[in-house]
Amino acid sequence: METCQEKLKISNDEMKKIVETNKNPKKKLTQAMRIHLREKEFKNWCDLKSKGKGVETFKDCKEVNKRIMEKRGLTNTEWIQILKMNGQVAPVRALHGRGQDNRCRHCDEIETLGHVLGFCDRGYLLRNTRHNTVRTLIADEFRRLKWNVYEEVHCINPSRSTQRIDILIYKNKNDKSYILDPTIRFEAGGNQSEDVNIEKKAHYDSVIPYFKEKYKLADIEVIGLFIGARGTITVDFENFRTKFDLSKEMRNNIALSVIKSSVQILQHHTYNL
């Protein structure tokens, strides 16, 4: 065991901690050491300034990560592109060593992966398709559970201009109803999920009276749902899913559709496919 510890470069203090935190006495110590090394490397990855951007989001839903790493529903080409996106080594111009010009090949912004997947006009229609697919998956799941569901509902705000919400759901008009806004953004770390929820609540707050009046609803809550552009599912999304008893299949389909669409956006941007 000492030889193994030495070869793996595990310090005595680390080894002591591994032994103390090994909650399952039946688990082999070598397995506990592997877990420790994996978590250590993940932390090192998260600490990287560029390549670790948003990586901590991957730890929130390991089931989805496992499905992606097992290539479920993915072609070999898609899987390779996903690995490149996750490691921040996709062929975008802002990547160190790609060339002197880091400007986008379709606009004048710096061509980062986040720009390609979330902002560049080149992928506008594909991003809309990616979003609409997620919206429909969520709406159909609520329909399966016998909720009243409305998609792409137009409304008028207090300034008399038109707005549109993604999903309106309710079961009983006297109970709480919900405006749902799934939002796909590139994982950047921090409290993105909470920030999206706060942002959407503020954005739709002014139209709540309109929907109360039109649909005769007693109470409406706005929920902003953050989904990572690299197919990550957050703790907040999982809490939302379990609160409404939505299926894991829906969650898995959302993650798969998002990551496949992001691959398509990247390839369309870089290779005109």
Give the residues covered by each predicted segment.
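Conserved, non-catalytic sequence blocks in retroelement Pol enzymes and Pol-derived host proteins
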Residues: 72-73, 94-97, 123-130, 189-196
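Short Cys/His-based metal-binding microdomains
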Residues: 98-139
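Mobile genetic element proteins and their domesticated derivatives, centered on retroelements
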Residues: 82, 104, 115, 120, ...
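Short amphipathic alpha-helices and their capping/turn residues within compact interaction modules
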Residues: 109-112, 143, 147, 172, ...
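Alpha-helical interaction elements in eukaryotic regulators
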Residues: 11-14, 25, 29, 75-78, ...
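Extended C-terminal regions of large enzymes
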Residues: 1-93, 99, 267
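Active-site metal-binding core of divalent-cation-utilizing nuclease and nuclease-like domains
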Residues: 95-100, 137-184, 198, 226
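Catalytic cores of nucleic-acid endonucleases
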Residues: 162-165, 177, 182-273
